[in-house]
A protein has these predicted regions:
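Small/polar loops that bind or transfer phosphate-bearing groups
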Residues: 24-25, 111-114, 143, 170, ...
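Short, acidic/turn-prone active-site loops that include or flank metal/cofactor-
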Residues: 27-28, 52-55, 79-80, 164-173, ...
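A polyampholytic, Gly/Pro-enriched intrinsically disordered region
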Residues: 94-102, 158-170, 232-243
Length: 249
């Protein structure tokens, strides 16, 4: 991880420091925020969240927008949608610096992120960056509903049953990974399937699994879309927040 500036180094973070609380605010429907997360959000003086793309509000910001009061300070943080390690580490460093500026003054910060904190969450990187330099910093976590659970709810099916094995692939860089998952698990979930949909569709056609496969776009949001039985949809144009559920017989 990239080095932090002197401001962040060597701090013992004594009792005057604020508390960092991560809030999983669910997959998109504001009513799916847990009671505990909503309580923490409404009591917060400083609310941080990932900044959206190209100046547009991000998903977490949109989820909590109607819950925020005018007196609450909002702190958008930049987490770029890239794979380059140096760019990501630099972004985590800068986000940690911004949050630390608040915490070191004794103010608490809540960080809202879509889904659940433990499921491919940006909060993990922020918390790790701060904890590495401030081991006595109090960090709390409030779990939320992640997108696969919202997706299967929309489809009206269980995610798993009895002894079903489950594989979740956050991104697909090789079709061999999907082949291996389908050989092993009864249920496979593909996140961010938008960029590889044609290749995945062809693989599922070869394995005769299209009828048991579905796509949910923007699960639980007002503009949610459901595509069941993918044999009917060989050429879908999907947005970023799209996931696929595949059930092997």
């Amino acid at each position: 991880m990239a080095n932090f500036p002197d401001l962040l180094k060597g701090s013992s973070c004594r009792s005057h420091c604020g508390i960092l609380t991560g809030l999983g605010v669910g997959p998109g429907d504001p009513d799916l925020i847990t009671v505990k997360a909503l309580t923490c959000l409404e009591q917060a003086a400083v609310v941080a969240y990932p900044r959206g793309r190209q100046g547009a509000p991000g998903l977490a910001q949109r989820i909590i927008a109607d819950r925020l009061a005018p007196h609450q300070h909002q702190l958008p943080l930049d987490f770029p949608y890239v794979l380059e390690a140096e760019i990501l580490e630099d972004a985590w460093q800068k986000a940690a610096e911004q949050v630390w500026q608040v915490l070191r003054q004794g103010q608490d910060v809540v960080f809202a992120c879509e889904g659940d904190l433990g499921f491919y969450s940006t909060f993990t990187y922020l918390a790790q960056a701060l904890a590495a330099h401030h081991p006595n910093l109090i960090i709390r976590r409030v779990p939320g509903i992640c997108s696969p659970m919202a997706a299967v709810s929309a489809l009206g099916i269980p995610l798993t049953l009895q002894s079903d094995k489950l594989v979740i692939l956050p991104a697909l860089y090789s079709l061999a990974d999907l082949d291996q998952a389908l050989d092993w698990a009864e249920v496979t979930v593909l996140l961010k399937v938008n960029s590889v949909y044609p290749q995945v569709w062809a693989l599922l056609q070869r394995r005769q699994l299209l009828h048991q496969s579905s796509v949910v776009v923007r699960a639980s949001q007002l503009d949610q879309e459901i595509y069941d039985d993918l044999s009917r949809y060989p050429e879908l144009q999907l947005p970023y927040f799209s996931l696929m559920v595949i059930r092997c017989p």
